[in-house]
Amino acid sequence: MGATTDHALGRNLRFFCKKEAAAGGAYGTASQEALAGADAAKVLSSSMEFTVTRNDRMDARGTRSIQERITGKQEVSWSCESYLLPAGSTTAPDIDPLIEGAMGGAFGASTAKTYKLSDSNALPTVHMARTANDVFREDLFGCWVEEMSISASGGEEPKISFSGGAFNYVLTGTGTTEGTGSSATSLVTESGNGVNFMVGSVISFNSLADKIVTAKSTDTLTIASSSWSDAQAITPTTYTETTAGNPLNGIGGSLTLNSVTLPVTAFDVTITNGVKPLSDAAFEKGTSDFIAGYRSVKGNISVRARKDFIKSLAQRYVQTTATAGPSFSSVPIRVDLGSVSGKQVVVYVDTAELDFAAIDVPEAEEAILNIPFTALATSGGGDEIRIAWNQ
């Protein structure tokens, strides 16, 4: 907040995410799916990017200057990062909708407090929003998760991050009512204020909240029947956050590779869904559906090149003679994050094939073994990785 005019401040950002009942969340309609304070999640950072392709008109025009442009497809992308925040008991993490969106399996659906992968094409979609200081609100509808990563290094706090795309984007600013309304559906704003609102904006005025803009014409917004007086502030709706959990520290936990505990310097694992957005259909402004492609689960372990740890790298490749075909090692990996019982996050990769990377040897300091891996599923599929919460 500035001295005379409100500013959006990162420290006041509120982030919300909710699994959609139907893909796209009924965007821009009177039944658009709503958010609430219970959908809040704490994030370290977030990004929402909206672009619309504008192509220069390229036919003959008698001048070297560009005089006209043509509208192309819209594209929406997003990312966010959070601490790992287990809350204990059977409470799902606040970021649960995004984990389920990445993995497909719900919290505790098969095994209590454990996320598992799903081979379904119908990965859940998420309605996501962030608000700041009554200055602006951004909403994304039909969010899919392309990547989810869990990482830890040194003594830093372990983190979870997500990225993906979405069907639709809405930016909501502020305005002021022009005139009064009684059980009216056309909310007139002061001249020039209309640009601060889009179809799908969720606004508050006259002690009313969650009013959805279903259409807009210059400075007139179409909303559900409402009443208001003149010169009232119109602001983006926000909610009082309800969140749970405390960050895991980076000094408690362990990693075992093939039953050997390693004092790792870094660890990460990433689920990539191979999502194909269906954005190439004619007569569509952007993406209205997607197909989940081949999934990969890959990661990396870094550990100092101590004499007794060389075998952790060497076991990736075994050759019995100079001409014999090699065999490749598949080993289990378990990562325990946190040390307080009931508030740990445990990552299980039951079958990991160790991949290849160079040993990092600096000029004077200790060498580092980099051990990349690819998680493999059994013949049934869908069991490359499990993530257990509140252990």
Name every feature range the model reports, one short phrase each.
Residues M1-Q391:
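Signature of extracytoplasmic/envelope-associated structural regions
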